[in-house]
Every structure is written in C-alpha cells, then in structure tokens.
Amino acid sequence: MVKNYKVITLCGSTRFKEQFFEVQKRLTLEGCIVISVGLFGHSGDEEVWKPGTKEMLDDMHKRKIDMADEIFVINVGGYIGVR
C-alpha cells in the first residue's frame, strides 16, 4: 500500500484494450493506485513487435506485479491467451 491506497496491477491479454481502460477507471475511482500495461500489441501498438521490445515489456510487467499489493486479471470470455 502507498499511504492508504491499495496498489493493483492489471493483467490479461492486450487484445482487450477497452476493458483495461474500463477496469483502470473503476478501480481508480474506488481509491486504488492502478498499474497497467503501457502498450497494447494485440490492439494496434506495432512498436511492441520490434526486436527486443516484447521481451523488455514482459519483464517490466513482472516488475509491475512485484510492486503491487494484488493483481486484477482481465479475463474476457475466459480468454487467458496462449502462454
């Protein structure tokens, strides 16, 4: 926690960009500090696919999870991806 605010990292497939934004907004209004993904490779952010970038972003996401008090999994229709 930071002061009285729970820190939550969002996890899930970047296919669901709109759902990430919806959940981020809701949790923020509930008084949480929300950490989310910075790019949505499956939703149009082509920079993700440059050599080395995807690996860096995956590692950064793990560090975001390390910083959080808890995670929130965005699981649209039960989809969890191929990994």
Show where each model-derived region lies:
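Conserved catalytic or regulatory cores that recognize and/or transform ribose-phosphate-containing ligands
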Residues: 1-83
